[in-house]
């Protein structure tokens, strides 16, 4: 029988299983869902394509989906984020996975294509950044005669276009068939959600989508508290630099930016923030951060971190103006926040995996982390298990919702209801010793809620 996985070394499975066992103790939400739904198997019949960082925490998510009855095939959504022992553990357990840390862009899209290869085709997508959804929809448009990506503007676009052509040649009509049998997608990140809302505006979303990112127990925890721990971890592992006393610039003060600024401040750095949004800028200022123009500090700061989800935030002219040995990294989803492509003709020296020194024309050098991709996953191991449990519990609930109640949804983008958001939070309280104060019936009536919740209206902003 031909093996149905691609991992770096299947012998790493035992190591991965040991770390999985530890992670499970830190992921109470997922373990609670296994206990609640393990017997009823609400995902029986679901064939889920997963495109999300192949980490130890994701391995616990995958095994939860399988425990609830799903068939799963998995690829990583980032070329540097895979933890090879996690991928090996999942492959050894019988779930097809296609992910290697440091895979090429061509391999990235080939592996994603392989994750779709169920015998009867997939019927659900669990996405992070929207690559799996994009792949199917671009391919279906190409099959309809549209010229997709007529002039590729990046290596990434060249790779996806080539993979779509390859699949069309091998399996004519495949993309359209897959698109039409997908019951829905649950999306993990801000970037992927933005893509989904764009599809809705254009009338091109062919199935329902659940925006997991904007569940409170995802965006206000994973994005903020996860980055608060993982950003500095990534910088330290990559550079061994002491951050205390250094000047760090965080570009963007959304949830990820807030966590990143707090991370650097906690390490003793003097943190400055850049922002385009007046509300976020005011928040940063009132949190005690100096809000500046990048151009005014680019020559004096030591560390630059992008968190925006936008493109061309750090441009080539900024990097040429930086001091010698400035550290540049990104914790947004894609690598285009930093104009890495504009550096290709400069002298690169690889220091170690995902750490490069680049010499500028004036002789100054900069340290680029993970080639501008997610440094907390490329240079470290990403967010801790506990905070990822909250995010992934939302993902499992979203997959159950899409599979068991697909007919209740139109081809729009939805957010999980408040009672499920509160359920996710509640499942994590015992692990950290939190005790809730109960409302008596009179108190509940006074503020217009049920004693058991939900406690806030849908429009409440935490």
From Swiss-Prot:
It is an enzyme of class 3 (hydrolase). GO terms for biological process: L-homocysteine biosynthetic process; one-carbon metabolic process; S-adenosylmethionine cycle. Its EC number is 3.13.2.1. Keywords: Cytoplasm, Hydrolase, NAD, One-carbon metabolism. Pathway: Amino-acid biosynthesis; L-homocysteine biosynthesis; L-homocysteine from S-adenosyl-L-homocysteine: step 1/1. Its cofactor is NAD(+). It catalyses: S-adenosyl-L-homocysteine + H2O = L-homocysteine + adenosine. It comes from the Bacteria. Substrate binds at residues 55, 128, 188, 218, 222. One of its GO terms (molecular function) is adenosylhomocysteinase activity. Gene3D superfamilies: Adenosylhomocysteinase-like, NAD(P)-binding Rossmann-like Domain. Binds 1 NAD(+) per subunit. NAD(+) binds at residues 189-191, 223, 252-257, 275, 310, 331-333, 376. GO terms for cellular component: cytosol. It is found in: Cytoplasm. SMART domains: AdoHcyase, AdoHcyase_NAD. Belongs to the adenosylhomocysteinase family. PANTHER family: ADENOSYLHOMOCYSTEINASE (PTHR23420:SF0). May play a key role in the regulation of the intracellular concentration of adenosylhomocysteine. This is Adenosylhomocysteinase. It comes from Roseobacter denitrificans (strain ATCC 33942 / OCh 114). The gene is ahcY.
């Amino acid at each position: 029988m031909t093996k149905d996985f691609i991992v770096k070394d299947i012998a790493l499975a035992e190591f991965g299983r040991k770390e999985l066992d530890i992670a499970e103790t830190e992921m109470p939400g997922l373990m609670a869902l296994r206990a609640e739904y393990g017997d009823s198997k609400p995902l029986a019949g679901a064939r889920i394509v997963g495109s999300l960082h192949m980490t130890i925490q994701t391995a616990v998510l995958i095994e939860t989906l399988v425990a609830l009855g799903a068939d799963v095939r998995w690829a990583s959504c980032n070329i540097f984020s895979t933890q090879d022992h996690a991928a090996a553990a999942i492959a050894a357990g019988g779930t097809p996975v296609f992910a290697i840390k440091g895979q090429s862009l061509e391999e990235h899209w080939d592996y994603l294509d392989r994750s779709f290869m169920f015998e009867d085709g997939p019927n659900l997508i669990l996405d992070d950044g929207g690559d799996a959804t994009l792949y199917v929809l671009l391919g279906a448009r190409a099959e309809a005669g549209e010229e997709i990506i007529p002039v590729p503007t990046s290596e990434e676009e060249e790779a996806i276009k080539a993979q779509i052509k390859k699949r069309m040649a091998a399996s004519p009509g495949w993309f359209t068939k897959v698109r039409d049998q997908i019951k829905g997608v649950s999306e993990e990140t801000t970037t992927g959600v933005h893509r989904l809302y764009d599809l809705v505006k254009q009338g091109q979303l062919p199935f329902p989508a659940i925006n997991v990112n904007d569940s409170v127990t995802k965006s206000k925890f994973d994005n903020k508290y996860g980055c608060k721990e993982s950003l500095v971890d990534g910088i330290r592992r990559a550079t061994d630099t002491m951050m205390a006393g250094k000047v760090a610039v965080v570009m963007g003060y959304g949830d990820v930016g807030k966590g990143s600024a707090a991370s650097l401040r906690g390490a003793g750095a003097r943190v400055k923030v850049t922002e385009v949004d007046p509300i976020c800028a005011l928040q940063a200022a009132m949190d005690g951060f100096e809000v500046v123009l990048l151009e005014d500090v680019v020559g004096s700061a030591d560390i630059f971190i992008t968190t925006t989800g936008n493109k061309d935030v750090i441009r080539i002219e900024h990097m040429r103006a930086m001091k010698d040995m400035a550290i540049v990294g990104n914790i947004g989803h894609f690598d285009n926040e930093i104009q890495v492509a504009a550096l290709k003709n400069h002298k690169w020296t690889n220091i170690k995996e995902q750490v490069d020194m680049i010499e500028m024309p004036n002789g100054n050098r900069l340290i680029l982390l993970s080639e501008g991709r997610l440094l907390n996953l490329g240079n470290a191991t990403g967010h801790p298990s506990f905070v990822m449990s909250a995010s992934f519990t939302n993902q499992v609930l979203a997959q159950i919702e899409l599979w068991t109640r697909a007919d209740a949804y139109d081809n729009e983008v939805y957010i999980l209801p408040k009672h499920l958001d509160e359920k996710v939070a509640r499942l994590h309280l015992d692990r950290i010793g939190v005790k809730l104060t109960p409302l008596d019936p009179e108190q509940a009536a006074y503020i217009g809620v049920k004693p058991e919740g939900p406690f806030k209206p849908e429009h409440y902003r935490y």
